Amino acid sequence: VFVAIVLILIVVAAGFGTILIDKYSYSKERADLDAYFGLMEENAVAIILQDEQAEEYARIWDGICYFDFATVHKYFNDRFYEDRQESMLIYTTPDSIIRTQIGSSVLETSLGESEDVGYTIARYEGDVLYVAADYVKRYANFSYSLYEAPYHMQVYTEWNERQVADITKDTQVRYQGGIKSDILTEVKQGDSVIILEEIENRTKVKTRD
């Protein structure tokens, strides 16, 4: 009887220890990044504008990133004009009018110049006009970096000073505060992150990707 009681106590103690370890150990679950960025379509690209995700999404075709026309006007430059009747994308500067046939890689100016940029400048997807980010960038002051797995892009229209911290040891960036929160990405010793917000014992950061 004594042996049985001891065995039961050992089993109970071991089980309690397992519960404690599980309760106070970090989660190893990885976040679903498609869900995190709200990506519902295979070629959708989440737009991180400054430090916040925009409600709009870019698209990627043939390795080229495109903004829909409304997004171009809203965030970058409202001087682009869509001529649906002629199927043209038009941009006007003080010195010239730049035209491109939608679906073409060639632009032409009112000064008689032409250039093949090497990618489709603008295209329709259904009734929505999309314009290549690199083409928009010719006439708007912004920078962007495109990342894969899943597709998302960092866009800056302002370049202010940021508070930066260096990672002192390999660790994980988690979706929310708490040891049970899912892992978003890994950071290595020596990596730099941007400090967005400090709340009690947690820090909201942005990694380079």
For the regions a language model picked out, list residue spans one by one:
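Noncatalytic linker/hinge segments flanking ATPase motor cores
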Residues: 190, 205-206
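Primary recognition of N-terminal secretory signal peptides and signal-anchoring hydrophobic helices
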Residues: 2-199
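Short aromatic-glycine-enriched beta-strand elements
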Residues: 200-204
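A short macromolecule-binding patch
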Residues: 165, 207-209
